């Protein structure tokens, strides 16, 4: 295990630029990243976004923070937000978000994420910035989450 990388990268989730910076002393940085991925010392969440294996993380990953990082601009909404607020009894595994971009789905080693397209004119109304120990993220208000749920269920 390359403990040095864990000590040099403070956050549990990091991007390609941070990795390149930490590994700049290696002759072939891309090959080194490939070896770290193959050995399981780092995990690719999405192209350009990485995390450490669970035993090296300082805290559990927050799916809402990841959802905002994986595809943007986006905010967590619909089923996942309703579950977060305790408005539906079901446990929701798929992190649902709204975006002004194209609809997308990502299946990653740390969870599944779905992004539904939202009209740009209505996008920013009713979004709240949530602060957690794992980072901050954008989430729909309770009312907006209900509205987005109605839109995505059409």
Predicted features and spans:
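Nucleic-acid-binding surface
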Residues: 53-154
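Short beta-edge/loop segments at beta->alpha junctions of small alpha/beta modules
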Residues: 1-73, 109, 124
């Amino acid at each position: 295990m390359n403990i040095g990388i864990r000590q040099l990268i403070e956050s549990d989730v990091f991007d390609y630029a941070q990795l390149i910076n930490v590994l700049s002393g290696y002759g072939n940085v891309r090959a080194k990243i490939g070896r770290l991925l193959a050995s399981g010392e780092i995990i690719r969440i999405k192209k350009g976004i990485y995390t450490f294996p669970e035993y090296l993380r300082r805290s559990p990953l927050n799916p809402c923070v990841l959802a905002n990082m994986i595809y943007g601009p986006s905010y967590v909404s619909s089923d996942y937000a309703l579950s977060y607020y305790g408005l539906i009894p079901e446990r929701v595994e798929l992190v649902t978000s709204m975006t002004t971009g194209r609809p997308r789905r990502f299946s990653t080693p740390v969870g599944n994420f779905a992004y539904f397209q939202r009209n740009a004119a209505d996008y920013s109304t009713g979004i709240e910035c949530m602060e957690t120990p794992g980072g901050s993220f954008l989430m729909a208000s309770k009312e907006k989450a209900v509205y987005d749920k109605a839109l995505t269920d059409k």
